[in-house]
């Protein structure tokens, strides 16, 4: 089954740039850009993917400071982006929607940050021709609304110059920070101007905010861990898929066991859902591994894995032609198995 899943042309719809660098890539990045190959750095990398039993969302977010330091220069950000694309390509991901929060520091402005990432995506096409990469700039709800408005303005600016690359906006960050309603103006502008919306919703048990988010609407829901049965029904009626990230939810402490993960209820009710990694580096996983967990936990068949992949194709922000090409790749893969 692992070989089948590994070779399957998969679709990744929920991947954060800075969280998707695995330990090998972190060491490659440190060595190439910063010349750091010390034993101390190796220990830092090991600690980066190590989770205690009492881990929670706050402890997970603390880990990102380590990677943000490595991507705080133009060269670091550029190489990190290339490494993430490389790692997903090596896992036979045929389509990747990468999300990242534009950052500003002494080395670059937020516009520069997005330009570096976009330019790297373009350059990577020749090196990794079998993976199609799109970008979703992220609003960090921990930051001021003015920063969110700048992020949306930049996303719209680059969506005009690179419409095949910038396809949506993500709202993420520490879920206990900021008020969702404060960001609705910026999100609504993005939606009115044609960008798709992905909202990290119900990561924590906050019923009033969950209701606000569902009322506001979204193209896809990130996590949905604390959605009620009524919320699930509302999502299904609106055909809003929930991005299920099993390892992430377990290691962050938001779900107590794989068996209790809400993906089970979504599959039983045939509600829209997609399997994703979230932060494959931080959580030391891959999309192949996530599918294997789904297979082993819920007794999912090969055909169901194919169906889950085709569902991800359907809910991607790719163009209609790109979705057809992705579905064709999956079909060719299935046909190749039948002729073996």
From Swiss-Prot:
Cofactor: how and how many bound: Binds 1 zinc ion per subunit.
Known EC number: 3.5.4.-
One annotated GO biological process: inosine biosynthetic process
SUPFAM superfamilies assigned: Metallo-dependent hydrolases (SSF51556)
Family in the record: Belongs to the metallo-dependent hydrolases superfamily. Adenosine and AMP deaminases family.
Keywords: Hydrolase, Metal-binding, Nucleotide metabolism, Zinc
Annotated source species: Drosophila pseudoobscura pseudoobscura
Cofactor field: Zn(2+)
Residue positions of the active site: 203 (proton donor)
Main enzyme class: hydrolase
Function: Catalyzes the hydrolysis of the free cytosolic methylated adenosine nucleotide N(6)-methyl-AMP (N6-mAMP) to produce inositol monophosphate (IMP) and methylamine. Is required for the catabolism of cytosolic N6-mAMP, which is derived from the degradation of mRNA containing N6-methylated adenine (m6A).
Name of this chain's protein: Adenosine deaminase-like protein
Residues the record lists as binding Zn(2+): 14, 16, 200, 278
Residues annotated as site: Important for catalytic activity: 223
């Amino acid at each position: 089954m692992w070989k089948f899943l590994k070779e399957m042309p998969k679709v990744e719809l929920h991947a954060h740039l800075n969280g998707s660098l695995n330990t090998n890539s972190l060491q490659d990045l440190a060595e190439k850009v910063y010349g750091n190959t010390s034993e101390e750095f190796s220990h830092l990398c090991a600690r980066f993917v190590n989770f205690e039993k009492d881990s929670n969302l706050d402890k997970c977010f603390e880990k990102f400071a380590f990677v943000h330091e490595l991507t705080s220069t133009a060269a670091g950000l550029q190489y990190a982006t290339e490494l993430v694309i490389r790692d997903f390509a090596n896992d036979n991901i045929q389509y990747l929607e990468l999300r990242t929060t534009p950052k500003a520091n002494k080395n670059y402005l937020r516009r520069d940050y997005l330009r570096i990432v976009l330019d790297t995506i373009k350059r990577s096409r020749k090196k990794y021709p079998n993976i199609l990469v799109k970008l979703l700039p992220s609003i960090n709800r921990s930051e001021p609304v003015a920063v969110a408005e700048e992020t949306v303005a930049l996303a719209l600016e680059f969506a005009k110059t690179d419409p095949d690359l910038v396809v949506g906006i993500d709202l993420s960050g520490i879920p206990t920070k900021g008020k969702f309603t404060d960001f609705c103006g910026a999100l609504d502008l993005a939606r009115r101007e044609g960008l798709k919306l992905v909202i990290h919703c119900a990561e924590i048990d906050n019923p009033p905010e969950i209701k606000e988010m569902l009322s506001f609407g979204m193209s896809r829901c990130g996590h949905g861990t604390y959605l009620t049965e009524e919320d699930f029904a509302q999502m299904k009626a609106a055909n809003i898929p929930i991005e299920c990230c099993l390892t992430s939810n377990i290691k962050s402490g938001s779900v107590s066991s794989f068996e209790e993960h809400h993906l089970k209820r979504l599959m039983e009710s045939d509600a829209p859902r997609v399997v994703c990694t979230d932060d494959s580096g931080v959580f030391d996983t891959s999309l192949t591994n996530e599918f294997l967990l789904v297979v082993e936990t819920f007794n999912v068949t090969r055909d169901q894995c194919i169906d889950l992949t085709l569902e991800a194709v359907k809910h991607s922000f790719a163009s209609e032609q790109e979705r057809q090409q992705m579905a064709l790749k999956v079909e060719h893969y299935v046909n190749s198995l039948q002729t073996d």
